[in-house]
């Protein structure tokens, strides 16, 4: 079985995928590659490829999905299958890029916690019994990574390229997945992504927002298990 490389989202680490790591690591090797080193998406993807196995399954959520698309663009022959979760294939709009600037100013002034609490975390999750626990975990991950990572990741996202042409070229088993209540990367955007990929499975996770790996972990893990057993008929 090929190993899996997971790519976490902005201000997240391996804990974003903890339920999936627990379930899937029983059967295969798993690596969580950092998305916090590098000034641009291209540089982050290059670092991933340097440390990744020769061939691997690739799964990214949010910013991790953006990096995953760049990894595939650079080395399609090394990616055996790809899962894109709660992510965005298009370049940043001028409006969204401008909206990051006040956040950057606040974080430079030592207000990372406030930015995460007031501006980012409220957009992340669907209503649910574990919402407060997951939000607390998001805060812990962000504070552990720190302000410099926030600044680098913000700039990298502002400068990212459009990956629609990359999606059209994907020739391996692809899973496109998002939370039903994701306000940052909507189900409609993911349906559009799935339509660009010649052979893909598109799933919307009920009862989840931007972080379904934590909000509905069993559903996501089950879908990933199915994705990992798809034959390499497209290779």
Predicted regions and their residues:
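Flexible "cap/lid" loop of the alpha/beta hydrolase fold
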Residues: 73-118
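Conserved HGGG/HGGXW glycine-rich cap/lid loop of the alpha/beta-hydrolase fold
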Residues: 1-47, 61
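Conserved alpha/beta-hydrolase "acid-adjacent" motif
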Residues: 134, 183-189
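Catalytic histidine neighborhood in serine/cysteine hydrolases
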Residues: 187, 191-210
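Conserved alpha/beta-hydrolase catalytic His-Asp/Glu region
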Residues: 92-95, 111-169
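Short beta-strand/loop motif that positions the catalytic acidic residue
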Residues: 170, 176-178, 182
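Catalytic histidine-centered segment of alpha/beta-hydrolase-like enzymes
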Residues: 208-221
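Gly/Ala-rich beta-loop-alpha elbow adjacent to hydrolase catalytic centers
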Residues: 60-64, 68
